[in-house]
């Protein structure tokens, strides 16, 4: 919690106090803002904050940009989904499990998963920095979410491995 909120607040205050300093403040954020599971509701940047620990942390994280906003800087908070990259992101964690034949859906598999490729995420940060039209929350996700069961089936297909062992719903909550 504090590893995200305190540094963001300090950086926002420093940017706000700098004479001839930046006119833009970009902060990382997360789609965890929307909560763990909102069912089939389509979520946009205008959607309300969800419930739960992660939603509370992300809400406080975004609120930590207030010094920059109050000083008149253009502030964008990039709400990032699950990052996909060949050598990192979520795949770095999941590939060994799936390669060992231990991969599978989480709980029912019906949860929506909003993801983004690393190159697209970098492009969003670049645009947030230089495009004056971007301010406030910016969802850094692909155009359509997928169900967890679809994601795990596709990952298993690409890796030529089975996806038969479901992960209990408690597993991801312990990690987060």
Located regions from the model:
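Conserved catalytic-site region of short-chain dehydrogenase/reductase
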Residues: 27-42, 49, 83-88
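Glycine/proline-rich active-site loop of Rossmann-fold NAD(P)-dependent oxidoreductases
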Residues: 59, 71, 84-93, 128-138
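Alpha-helical substrate-binding/gating segment
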Residues: 66, 95-103, 111-145
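Mid/C-terminal beta-alpha module of Rossmann-like enzyme folds, strongest
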Residues: 124-175
């Amino acid at each position: 919690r504090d590893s995200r909120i305190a540094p963001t607040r300090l950086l926002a205050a420093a940017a706000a106090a700098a004479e001839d300093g930046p006119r833009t403040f970009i902060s990382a954020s997360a789609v965890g803002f929307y909560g763990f599971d909102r069912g089939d509701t389509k979520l946009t940047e205008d959607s309300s904050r969800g419930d739960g620990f992660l939603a509370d942390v992300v809400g406080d994280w975004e609120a930590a940009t207030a010094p920059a906003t109050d000083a008149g800087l253009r502030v964008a908070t990039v709400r990032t989904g699950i990052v996909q990259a060949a050598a990192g992101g979520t795949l770095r964690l999941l590939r060994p499990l799936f390669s060992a034949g231990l991969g599978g859906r989480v709980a029912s598999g019906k949860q929506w998963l909003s993801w983004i490729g690393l190159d697209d995420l970098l492009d969003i940060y670049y645009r947030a920095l230089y495009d004056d039209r971007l301010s406030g929350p910016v969802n850094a996700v692909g155009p359509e979410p997928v169900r967890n069961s679809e994601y795990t089936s596709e990952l298993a297909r690409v890796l030529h491995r089975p996806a038969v062992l479901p992960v209990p719903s408690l597993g991801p909550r312990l990690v987060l």
